[in-house]
């Protein structure tokens, strides 16, 4: 229903316009207060790169963060990552991740980024506190913040927006009548716009999410996902249909697709109940970090990597590395 409202297919979005106007006024006033100097943002002693969205819902932001961290690491840059830690609840903040940190404490995306990149990761509702925790514990040269485009309390040097190339900006309205956190005109002020799927427009960087081999949660064994049979697909991400479409494109045809809420807590019994005798569970890598502790033999995940096209990605990386002292 929300997808139909935000796309404009359902006329119900008109009923929500008063709330959207209120959302837009408040969010605009917050941004203006920082722009005019009525409020002051905290500036880190190292460059800060924000990777965020203009819309609610999954746009492929976390794969972009992982891509950016890995590319900078390949250039010898010491990178730290901060996040709000959605879906997690720690006893105290900021929380600096360790190999033992669970998704229940840190959230699924920070744990995934930490496991994939090995970069220092810290979470806190106040992003500046997370940055300070990393700087106190690690000699990093640059900070990447996973989400937080609208978190103006943290000053930033580079802003990158990730856009779903198929859904774009829906009906163009602020939440809750539409998907927008900020209006599309905000694109004029960011340093780069990366478009996940669909067709990129002039000045935008095209990106595709490229699936790898399926990985068994218990053994680490790898195989072509099309070789798995009797698949039940599970996706607890911002836009589950994208994952299900990826499986179909890989030649894996799920018998059942189970969409879950983004950052949803997964209880062992609930996940186990999805899979019948002789069936194979295939999930996203983000779900896998929550399920690994209680995984069964026939549970697999399909990792995806961001692939950015054209000359612009190299120019963006050169621009970012030029800020590192």
UniProtKB/Swiss-Prot annotation:
Keywords: ATP-binding, Kinase, Lipid A biosynthesis, Lipid biosynthesis, Lipid metabolism, Nucleotide-binding, Transferase. This is Tetraacyldisaccharide 4'-kinase. The keyword Transferase applies. ATP binds at residues 55-62. One of its GO terms (cellular component) is plasma membrane. GO terms for biological process: lipid A biosynthetic process; lipopolysaccharide core region biosynthetic process. It comes from Salmonella schwarzengrund (strain CVM19633). InterPro entries: LpxK, P-loop_NTPase. Pathway: Glycolipid biosynthesis; lipid IV(A) biosynthesis; lipid IV(A) from (3R)-3-hydroxytetradecanoyl-[acyl-carrier-protein] and UDP-N-acetyl-alpha-D-glucosamine: step 6/6. One of its GO terms (molecular function) is tetraacyldisaccharide 4'-kinase activity. Transfers the gamma-phosphate of ATP to the 4'-position of a tetraacyldisaccharide 1-phosphate intermediate (termed DS-1-P) to form tetraacyldisaccharide 1,4'-bis-phosphate (lipid IVA). Its EC number is 2.7.1.130. It is an enzyme of class 2 (transferase).
């Amino acid at each position: 229903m929300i997808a139909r409202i935000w796309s404009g297919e359902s006329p119900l979005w008109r009923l929500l316009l008063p709330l959207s106007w209120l959302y837009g006024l408040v969010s605009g006033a917050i941004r203006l207060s920082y722009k005019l100097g009525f409020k002051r943002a905290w500036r880190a002693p190292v460059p800060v790169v924000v990777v965020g969205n203009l819309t609610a819902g999954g746009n492929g932001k976390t794969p972009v963060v992982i891509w950016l961290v890995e590319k900078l690491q390949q250039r010898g840059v010491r990178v730290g990552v901060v996040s709000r830690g959605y879906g997690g609840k720690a006893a105290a903040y900021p929380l600096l991740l360790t190999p033992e940190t669970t998704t229940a404490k840190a959230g699924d995306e920070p744990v995934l980024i930490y496991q994939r990149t090995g970069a220092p990761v810290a979470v806190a509702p106040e992003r500046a506190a997370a940055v300070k925790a990393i700087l106190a514990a690690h000699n990093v040269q640059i900070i990447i913040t996973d989400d937080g485009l609208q978190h103006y309390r943290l000053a930033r040097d580079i802003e990158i927006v990730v856009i779903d190339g198929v859904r774009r900006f829906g009906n163009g309205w602020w939440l809750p009548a539409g998907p927008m956190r900020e209006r599309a005109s905000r694109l004029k002020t960011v340093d780069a716009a990366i478009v996940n799927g669909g067709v990129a427009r002039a000045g935008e960087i095209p990106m595709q999410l490229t699936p790898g081999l399926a990985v068994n949660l218990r053994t680490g064994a790898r195989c072509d996902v099309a070789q798995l049979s009797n698949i039940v697909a599970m996706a607890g991400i911002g836009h589950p249909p994208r994952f299900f479409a990826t499986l179909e494109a890989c030649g894996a045809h799920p018998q059942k697709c189970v969409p879950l809420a983004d950052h949803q807590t997964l209880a062992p019994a609930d996940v186990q109940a999805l899979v019948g005798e002789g069936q194979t569970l295939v999930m996203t890598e983000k779900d896998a970090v929550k399920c690994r502790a209680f995984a069964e033999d026939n549970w697999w995940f399909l990792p995806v990597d961001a692939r950015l096209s054209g000359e612009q990605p190299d120019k963006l990386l050169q621009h970012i590395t030029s800020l590192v002292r």
